[in-house]
Swiss-Prot record:
Uppermost EC category: translocase
Protein name according to UniProt: NAD(P)H-quinone oxidoreductase chain 4 1
A UniProt-annotated Pfam family: Proton_antipo_M
Taxonomic superkingdom: Bacteria
Source species taxonomy: Bacteria, Bacillati, Cyanobacteriota, Cyanophyceae, Synechococcales
Chain's gene name: ndhD1
Organism: Synechococcus elongatus (strain ATCC 33912 / PCC 7942 / FACHB-805) (Anacystis nidulans R2)
Transmembrane residue ranges: 6-26, 37-57, 87-107, 113-133, 137-157, 169-189, 209-229, 243-263, 277-297, 311-331, 332-352, 376-396, 417-437, 461-481
EC number(s) per entry: 7.1.1.-
Length: 533
């Protein structure tokens, strides 16, 4: 970081964290002052990141930008090292938008409002730090930091089984985090030099066995967060018990941390191991797509149904990452952004319905369309986006993943079977989502829910619109987002493809048939992203 450069990323991370500290001292009995204070901080931080990226981020540059690096704990080689590139910058903006809207969605929280908003702001900063950290140990620390607020948000403000869901969440994620630490230390100590810096780790020459073991460790850790089968079982319980703002953050941001980390660590740091593991990712992606969709059918709890839908949609992220090419990576990243908006909207609207009906059991809810026509319209549009209706962001992202995998270097048989099985998910998704809409909003109204149910309020309309407008905008003009990371994903795909001929030769070309494209890629090599000071 040069002396002339303002530490924008540090400011974006520390603003919500430091602003959370005085919340316990704010004189406020009913939580009104704390709500407005928290909302102001969220908006200010979101505005700060929009301004910083607008002024200082160059989308034509593939490498790291806005780099900040300060020695923090030199005794252990820990640096406060931050940067963004095309992979992380869109996810930082997604974090700012969804977290700010989650603050607005929590307006009716009256139980311990000071603690609630303190945790939201702490989580806000920790999530941004995960997407911007460029030091392995710093990444591990902020990855762990976000676990505590999420645990408390579920255990204090969740449903009847909140303690079970929160404990399951913390056990899964905390134990999985140990794999990050062990794999990170193994890479840091490898070779003649010791370093936690991700750029330096990307330049090291690892033995194949070390790469494979580190890749497996990272895959387990990030697979838990991404809810890869069979590491997913914490997610339906967490969503089923968390309140609406908590579910918005779980689905909108936390799942994306797993997908982002898979690309940043498994693909970028360990490209040769990724080539050997990628077929496994493709198979796991198919399992996620079909397993999640089938389980969504079986759920009578509205939020658990949406949770299994999220598991299914994350399968497309795995397929995109497994495709070896820039189109697949583009699709994976676009799917993360799209799902972050759509899932946050679905869980928010589920919370709107719950506040009126006081139940999440779909058999107890029917005929809400006449009582809540605006909510019905919003729910319908969001469900259409989730089932990948053309004109919505979900359609573009899933189509891009399909095209990327179709153009991959796998054998024609493997590609054909994978695409056909993934298409099953495209058939199942509208079936369970349209069935959900029919059961909730059509039929005879259940009078036990009350004589009259209030429709969505202006505040709730605003939250829904802020999530749906970018969903529609990306669907009609995907370049709004893809132009941000096209250069980065192209360079990253070239780095992976440069290892394809060697691996294919070692495996006798059993899965890899389109070798001319891979051999052409060997002319391009990106051992680590360039750094801009």
């Amino acid at each position: 970081m040069t002396s002339e450069q303002f530490p924008w990323l540090t400011g974006i991370i520390l603003l919500p964290i430091l602003a959370a500290l005085p919340i316990p001292l704010i004189p406020d009995k009913d939580g009104r002052t704390v709500r407005w204070y928290s909302l102001f901080v969220g908006l200010a931080d979101f505005a700060l990141m929009v301004y910083a990226f607008w002024q200082h981020f160059d989308r034509s540059e593939a490498g790291l930008q806005m780099v900040e690096k300060i020695s923090w704990v030199p005794q252990i080689g820990l640096n406060w090292s931050l940067a963004v590139d095309g992979l992380s910058m869109p996810l930082v903006l997604l974090t700012g938008l969804v977290t700010t809207l989650a603050i607005l969605a929590s307006w009716n929280i009256n139980v311990k409002p000071k603690l609630f908003h303190f945790l939201l702001l702490l989580l806000y900063g920790a999530q941004i730090a995960v997407f911007t950290a460029q030091d392995m140990m710093l990444f591990f620390l902020v990855w762990e930091l976000e676990l505590v607020p999420v645990y408390l948000l579920i255990s204090i403000w969740g449903g009847p089984k909140r303690q079970y869901a929160a404990t399951k969440f913390i056990l899964y994620t905390a134990l999985a985090s140990l794999f990050i630490l062990v794999a990170g230390l193994a890479l840091a100590f490898s070779g003649d030099s010791f370093s936690f810096d991700l750029t330096e780790l990307g330049l090291k020459d690892y033995s194949l066995w070390l790469e494979l073991l580190a890749y497996a460790g990272f895959l387990i850790a990030f697979g838990v967060k991404l809810s890869i089968f069979p590491l997913h079982t914490w997610l339906p319980d967490a969503h089923g018990e968390a309140n609406a703002p908590g579910s918005m953050l779980l689905a909108g941001i936390l799942l994306k941390m797993g997908g982002y980390a898979l690309i940043r660590f498994n693909v970028q740091l360990l490209p040769e191991a990724h080539i050997r593991f990628a077929p496994v990712l493709a198979v796991l992606g198919i399992v996620n797509i079909i397993y999640g969709a089938l389980n969504a059918f079986a759920q009578d709890n509205l939020k658990r149904k949406i949770a299994y839908s999220s598991i299914s949609h994350m399968g497309f992220v795995l397929l995109g990452i497994a495709a070896y090419n820039s189109l697949g990576l583009n699709g994976a990243l676009l799917q993360m952004l799209s799902h972050g908006l759509i899932a946050a909207a679905l869980f928010f609207l589920a919370g709107v319905a719950y506040e009126r009906t006081h139940t999440l059991q779909i058999p107890q809810i029917s005929g809400l369309a006449k009582q809540m026509p605006i909510t019905f319209a919003l729910f319908t549009v969001t469900a259409m986006a989730s089932l990948a209706l053309p004109g919505m962001s979900g359609f573009v992202s899933e189509l891009t993943v399909f095209l990327g995998f179709t153009d991959s270097v796998y054998s024609s048989g493997f590609r054909t079977v994978t695409i056909l099985l993934a298409a099953v998910g495209l058939v199942l998704t509208p079936m369970y989502l349209l069935s959900m809409l029919r059961r909730i909003f059509y039929g005879t109204y259940n009078i036990q829910l009350g004589q009259v149910l209030a429709d969505a309020k202006p505040r709730e309309l605003f939250v829904a619109f802020c999530l749906l407008v970018p969903t529609l905008a990306i669907g009609f003009y995907p370049k709004l987002t893809t132009q941000v990371y096209d250069v980065t994903t192209t360079a990253l795909a070239a780095q992976v493809q440069s290892n394809l001929p060697v691996v294919a030769l070692a495996q006798q070309g059993s899965l890899y048939s389109q070798m001319p494209a891979a051999e052409e890629a060997t002319a391009v090599s990106m051992t680590a992203p360039p750094v801009i000071d």
